[in-house]
Regions:
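Formylglycine-dependent
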Residues: 3, 13-118, 123, 153-177
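Histidine-centered active-site microenvironments of extracellular/periplasmic hydrolases
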Residues: 17-26, 107-109, 192-271
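Beta-strand elements within well-structured catalytic alpha/beta cores of enzymes
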Residues: 1, 81, 94-100, 176, ...
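C-terminal cap/loop subdomain of S1 sulfatases and analogous C-terminal strand-loop tails that border
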Residues: 20-29, 33-38, 233-263, 274-284, ...
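Flexible glycine/proline-enriched surface loops and loop-helix/loop-strand junctions
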Residues: 58-67, 114-119, 167-173, 231-235, ...
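Loop/turn elements at helix/coil->beta-strand transitions in domains of secreted/extracellular proteins
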Residues: 1-6, 25-28, 90-96, 199-205, ...
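Alpha-helical "lid/cap" subdomains adjacent to substrate-binding clefts that gate access
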Residues: 121-151
Length: 357
């Protein structure tokens, strides 16, 4: 019977060649952008290649809001994903890849969401990094001895900024926080639909992000932030290394790098029917390449040695299923990764990193 397969959100793979787009690569339904990012409120006005919105293989010339507020991609991606689920064959299981562009730049958000966070960051990154680190340690997120990395040398002390600059930086972080708030709202909307359809208990949900905080551009951010209309037409405004340093607490460095600040990212699996509730922190390490073997095992599928007369390379990851019942993961080899000439090797409690190797 197989799975119905849906993609809502960004694709960011082989955008210049339509033969590599979602429908040509195994998905039944697609709504989103082929590129890695787009404007949140008006993606149909973004003329850069692949930055607009597509429904299947066809460009959407004029986007239409799916809610009672202005069109916003996070809302639209979720609502189209829900439509795919509701219109699918109820006799078939489904695979949904909901790939939000938020909180990737351009940093744009609904103003009512931004207003929730205005003023919350006026304590500045120096104080807030300490507060976050203390809370992380109190929660047991890290083991005893985890220190807070120094402030990025490119970032000035918060106390050296004048009041107007502090207010600007507070707004930049408030917009970023609002983008994540909107994700939270929409994930909640999707979960409500699954519960109403009695699919929640036996649906495995994997929530993860592809990299650490983004410090691209000037340390204090780039692009328009005060003028709302101009802000929402920007293509790359962001919050800079100053706030990315806070987002990466307690780690060093950011997206692009293989230090913990760039590669240690949030990732959780929720599956009430298959994962035993646990009371204690589980500390075995996992890597993205472990997801595929995990899904194959859960679905009872054996990875083939060949396909259409082609020999397939063996899987490099391991199944994460032992963690579902609190058992440790066992690897026969260290974990390796390379990205943009940055690399790491993890073996047990040790991590070796290379920058510009």
């Amino acid at each position: 019977m197989g799975y119905s397969s849906y993609l809502a959100g960004k694709w960011h793979l082989g955008g210049a060649h339509k033969s590599l787009w979602p429908l040509q690569r195994g998905f039944d339904r697609f709504y989103g952008c082929v590129a890695g990012s787009t404007r949140f409120f008006s993606p149909d006005t973004d003329q850069r290649e692949g930055r607009g919105i597509y429904s299947g293989n066809q460009p959407v010339r004029k986007v239409t809001s799916t809610t009672d507020r202005a069109y916003y991609t996070t809302d639209a991606f979720t609502d189209h994903a829900i439509r795919f689920i509701k219109s699918g064959d109820e006799k078939k299981p489904f695979f949904l890849y909901l790939s939000y562009t938020a909180p990737h730049w351009p940093h744009q958000a609904h103003e009512e969401d931004v207003d929730k966070y205005r003023g919350k960051y006026l304590k500045g990154w120096d104080e807030l990094r300490k507060v976050r680190h203390q809370r992380q340690m109190q929660l047991g997120l890290f083991e005893k001895g985890q220190t807070l990395s120094p402030r990025d040398e490119k970032v000035p002390a918060w106390s050296t900024l004048d009041l107007e600059k502090q207010k600007e930086m507070d707004l930049r972080m408030a917009v970023y926080a609002a983008m994540i708030d909107c994700i939270d709202q929409n994930v909640g909307k999707l979960l409500h639909v699954l519960k109403k359809r009695e699919q929640f208990e036996n649906t495995m949900i994997l929530f993860l992000t592809d990299n650490g905080a983004c410090a691209e551009g000037p340390a204090l951010g780039r692009g328009e932030i005060h003028d709302i209309d101009k802000r929402n037409l920007e293509t790359n405004n962001n919050y800079g290394a100053a706030w990315a340093n806070l987002s990466s607490t307690p780690f060093r460095l950011y997206k692009h790098f293989t230090h913990e600040g760039g590669s240690a990212t949030p990732f959780f699996i929720h599956w009430p029917s298959g994962i035993k509730p646990q009371k204690n922190w589980y500390r075995s390490q996992a890597q993205l390449i472990d997801v595929f073997p995990t899904l194959l095992e859960v679905c009872g599928v054996k990875y083939p040695e060949s396909f259409e007369d082609r020999k397939l390379s063996p899987l490099r990851g391991i199944s994460l299923s032992p963690s579902f019942v609190g058992k440790p993961l066992e690897r026969s080899k260290p974990m390796f990764s390379e990205h943009e000439n940055n690399a790491f090797m993890i073996d047990g409690k040790w991590k070796l990193v290379g920058k510009g190797v």
